[in-house]
Amino acid sequence: MISDRVKKGLKRAPNRSLLKACGYTDEELERPFIGVVNSFTEVVPGHIHLRDIAEAVKKGIYANGGTAFEFNTMAICDGIAMGHEGMKYSLPSREIIADTVESMAKAHGFDGLVLIPSCDKIVPGMIMGAIRTGLPFIVVTGGPMFPGELRGKKYDLISVFEGVGACAAGKITEEELKEIEDIACPGAGSCAGLFTANTMACLTEAMGLSLPYCATSHATTAEKIRIAKRSGMRIVDLVRNNITPDKILTKEAFENAILVDLALGGSTNTTLHIPAIANEVKPKFITLDDFDRLSGEVPHIASLRPGGEHFIIDLHRAGGIPAVLKVLEEKIRKECLTVSGKTIGEIIKEVKYIDYSVIRPVDNPVHETAGLRILKGSLAPNGAVVKIGAVNPKMYKHEGPARVFDSEEEAVDAILGGDIERGDVVVIRYEGPAGGPGMREMLAPTSAICGMGLDDSVALITDGRFSGGSRGPCIGHVSPEAMAGGPIAIVEDGDIIKIDMINKKLDLALDEEEIKERLAKWKKPEPKVKKGYLARYAKLVSSADEGAVLRYD
């Protein structure tokens, strides 16, 4: 066992003494050492219940003959960080989380890991760090929050964000907004729709890194505790059988995750996180081109929030991710191994129930095209991303004058102030990975646009990114970003922007010579942050089309 390096032999008497100071017995030191990576915190609703899940995991580890060592890493709530400087730290926190998992596992000689993440950046961050260790690992995602209810109608966090815009437009009163605010998030769990956290949980299961039904099993249920306990038992078997990440995370496993993502219409943030996770297996193992290639293989089969009517609880009751895999069976790579010990094909064979009103058959989909689309053109030579499944079909093609803003705050003030007209294309730049720095989510401006009823006539384009809760014609991840001298940096108010989601095009309606002349005159602005973690991050981070990972060179 790897743990022998810290516990075996005469020279390791001091190491054993320190472990005994923690209360571990000689008998416990003989067993496989399993690191239980928790991300409990009292400030993130998706993580406030994770101590209970960790306890269940540890019981499972001991039940199967392992010894559990729990430690923590950080977790940022994107919703609380939204709309202010705090959001600059969200995406960069993914790299810190990866580093902490790698560091703790390597320093203490663990034989395997159980990861307990829940929200947006914590899921990919933990997985990235675990891959670096080369150790067997299993993921127990914290589970979704139930939707809130008021007078027979269901609500979630996005209801509150959009309520702000509706209130600003005079559609609802402040008292009505307060009512929604009070009930929309009723307790523990990741926000109730197919936003980034739940999307990443679904893709983690589709990749084979979680037990079946883990992704959609809700946060505070006994079912989640049982899955956690079984995961603890299962990691000991993975260690004994040396089922390392390379045996599970094949190219085909990543393709399964992307196919599920495209079919469900998941968060656009997956186009950052899946390439970043794959990059830990092999550089450029998965790129935007893979999303583009696979988008032609599956339709959009589930009408889930924010673009649709159903919540994750509906997806779970309809059969969860195994049912989604079953519906996509003809396209899924069924030979892929999972942490359950079964292949994806074997999991598919065990599916007994599918509610086709929620998970639609491929011959009767929600939309004929996949839920995400990669756009390229003179405004985004290296690519941009849109959740087409959450866009009003009237906006699939759109031409309009640019309204240019160099920060999210400026754009939100203009939108809520009534300065944006129907037909406009709002451009928010210098919000990319390096320019922000941190590539903030633009949920406040997109929710304001939707809440004010402009999402059928106003598009938003940014080198920043969007919350998984964003809906409407929101095109993000424009690459190269403005801070890198991409064409988005030279857009001027009134320039016509052409959007064609059907043909995957995003163009600035200027001739090539004009674009070249403007780019030649462009001067890189001073960094917004000059000290601390964000300053270091801005210097090392790669482009959004490369997953916004940190460069080693």
Swiss-Prot record:
Belongs to the IlvD/Edd family. Pfam families: ILV_EDD_C (PF24877), ILVD_EDD_N (PF00920). Functions in the biosynthesis of branched-chain amino acids. Catalyzes the dehydration of (2R,3R)-2,3-dihydroxy-3-methylpentanoate (2,3-dihydroxy-3-methylvalerate) into 2-oxo-3-methylpentanoate (2-oxo-3-methylvalerate) and of (2R)-2,3-dihydroxy-3-methylbutanoate (2,3-dihydroxyisovalerate) into 2-oxo-3-methylbutanoate (2-oxoisovalerate), the penultimate precursor to L-isoleucine and L-valine, respectively. Keywords: 2Fe-2S, Amino-acid biosynthesis, Branched-chain amino acid biosynthesis, Iron, Iron-sulfur, Lyase, Magnesium, Metal-binding. Homodimer. It is an enzyme of class 4 (lyase). Pathway: Amino-acid biosynthesis; L-isoleucine biosynthesis; L-isoleucine from 2-oxobutanoate: step 3/4; Amino-acid biosynthesis; L-valine biosynthesis; L-valine from pyruvate: step 3/4. Its EC number is 4.2.1.9. InterPro entries: Dihydro-acid_dehy_C, DihydroxyA_deHydtase, DiOHA_6PGluconate_deHydtase_CS, ILV_EDD_C, ILV_EDD_N, IlvD/EDD_N. The active site is at S467 (proton acceptor). It catalyses: (2R)-2,3-dihydroxy-3-methylbutanoate = 3-methyl-2-oxobutanoate + H2O; (2R,3R)-2,3-dihydroxy-3-methylpentanoate = (S)-3-methyl-2-oxopentanoate + H2O. It comes from the Archaea. Binds 1 [2Fe-2S] cluster per subunit. This cluster acts as a Lewis acid cofactor. The modification N6-carboxylysine is found at K121. The gene is ilvD. [2Fe-2S] cluster binds at C119, C191. GO terms for molecular function: 2 iron, 2 sulfur cluster binding; dihydroxy-acid dehydratase activity; hydro-lyase activity; magnesium ion binding. This is Dihydroxy-acid dehydratase. The keyword Metal-binding applies. Its cofactor is [2Fe-2S] cluster; Mg(2+). Mg(2+) binds at D78, D120, K121, E441. GO terms for cellular component: cytosol. PANTHER family: D-XYLONATE DEHYDRATASE, D-XYLONATE DEHYDRATASE YAGF-RELATED. One of its GO terms (biological process) is isoleucine biosynthetic process.
